[in-house]
Swiss-Prot record:
Subunit structure: F-type ATPases have 2 components, F(1) - the catalytic core - and F(0) - the membrane proton channel. F(1) has five subunits: alpha(3), beta(3), gamma(1), delta(1), epsilon(1). F(0) has three main subunits: a(1), b(2) and c(10-14). The alpha and beta chains form an alternating ring which encloses part of the gamma chain. F(1) is attached to F(0) by a central stalk formed by the gamma and epsilon chains, while a peripheral stalk is formed by the delta and b chains.
Signal peptide: none
Gene Ontology molecular-function annotations: proton-transporting ATP synthase activity, rotational mechanism; proton-transporting ATPase activity, rotational mechanism
Protein's UniProt name: ATP synthase subunit b
Amino acid sequence: MPTLLLGAAIPFGTIAYTLFIFLLLLVMLRKFAWGPLMGIMKEREEHVANEIDAAERNNAEAKKLVEEQREMLKQSRVEAQELIERAKKQAVDQKDVIVAAAKEEAESIKASAVQEIQREKEQAIAALQEQVASLSVQIASKVIEKELKEEDQVKLIRDYIKEVGEAR
């Protein structure tokens, strides 16, 4: 006897056969398709989880490396600043040494020049004294040789002084 399903007459055998085939299909799908599909999905899930873990580890390692690089950069900057400060101090020290040496050399040159000037002054005075003495002797001998009037003596002295001025 046919059973009515949704107002349509479908024989019971067809329903039972269709139900049996459907259940058989479900069992076969579960055994042959669902298991392998679930296995593949499980593998894929594990693979994705492993990839996420690896990415997180890599990210953590990258952050650690970035922090290390920042520390190294900071240390390099500190060392560079210290090096610059040492170089500046060394330059100032060298400048002080050079300036002191230049002052010492200038004082030495100045002292030497003063000594040279003093020596030349003494030589000039000695030469002048010798010349004056010589001229005095010459004038005296000429005055003695001839007795001159006062005018002639003055003229003679002026001539000798003029002669000495031209000789210089």
